[in-house]
Curated annotation (Swiss-Prot):
Superkingdom: Eukaryota
Chief subcellular location: plastid
Name under which the protein is recorded: Photosystem II reaction center protein M
Signal peptide boundaries: none
Species this chain originates from: Chlorokybus atmophyticus
Bilayer topology term: Single-pass membrane protein
Annotated family: Belongs to the PsbM family.
Subcellular location: Plastid, Chloroplast thylakoid membrane
Length: 36
């Protein structure tokens, strides 16, 4: 049970962290593009 929960947490972090990072980069690029 604990292993499954830790696995889900690790998988969630592995997916959320890169996704949020790319999302932030996209938002910054989009905002800069609209400004200029």
């Amino acid at each position: 049970m604990e292993v499954n929960i830790l696995g889900l947490i690790a998988t969630a972090l592995f997916i959320i962290i890169p996704t949020s990072f790319l999302l932030i980069l996209y938002v910054q690029t989009a905002s800069q593009g609209s400004k200029s």
